[in-house]
Amino acid sequence: MTKGILGRKVGMTQIFTKNGILVPVTVIEATPNVVLQVKTNESDGYEAVQVGYQDMREVLSNKPAKGHAAKAKTSPKRFIREIRDVELKDYEVGSEITVDSFSEGDVVDVTGTTRGHGTQGNIKRWGQSRGPETHGSRYHRIPGSMGSIINRVPKGKKLPGHMGGKKVTVQNLVIEKVVPEKNVLLIKGNVPGAKNSLIFVKSAAKAAK
């Protein structure tokens, strides 16, 4: 069954494994998430658990949000997500989900919002090569040919535009270490997002059985 938790990206560091191998890891701080709602087939048409992360000032929340959080005996949350394919009997409204639900060696999918780079050209956005700088070349950093078909640009053509700031999921990352006393997960490799950005960690959908 699927496990999941919301947290924030602290940054990257490196640790030694038990075999003495140096491994780069991303530090994810995931303070306890509160179960705000348990959705069932009878009431909602599907099964899921709704979790909230990071308290919001009540001044910034509206009455529906306050009432929804009050049912779980907690304050309104800034971030709310749903986790599907869960064992509903393991969750109660108002209970907490902590990093203890994961263990070392678990394979997870990590979702975050990539760092925004604004408007960029083909070379930075798509990693294309630049043209010659001399010998009469007029092709330095421009996109190049638009294709052999006239009067239109083919769909999917790689062109300059907005780079980053998109929701991205990196699959099949391994949890190297769990530090419950600090609410921290150490995940092997890098994950999308800037420091302090929201990160969603859940059980891998395509992990080897």
Curated annotation (Swiss-Prot):
Annotated stretches, region: Disordered: 112-146
GO molecular function list: rRNA binding; structural constituent of ribosome
Tree of life domain: Bacteria
SUPFAM superfamilies, sorted: Translation proteins
Compositionally biased residues, Polar residues: 112-122
Secretion signal, residue range per the UniProt entry: none
GO biological process, one term: translation
Keywords: Ribonucleoprotein, Ribosomal protein, RNA-binding, rRNA-binding
GO-annotated cellular components: cytosolic large ribosomal subunit
PANTHER family found in the cross-reference section: 50S RIBOSOMAL PROTEIN L3, LARGE RIBOSOMAL SUBUNIT PROTEIN UL3C
Quaternary structure annotation from Swiss-Prot or TrEMBL: Part of the 50S ribosomal subunit. Forms a cluster with proteins L14 and L19.
Family statement: Belongs to the universal ribosomal protein uL3 family.
Function: One of the primary rRNA binding proteins, it binds directly near the 3'-end of the 23S rRNA, where it nucleates assembly of the 50S subunit.
Name of the molecule in the record: Large ribosomal subunit protein uL3
Organism (species): Lactobacillus johnsonii (strain CNCM I-12250 / La1 / NCC 533)
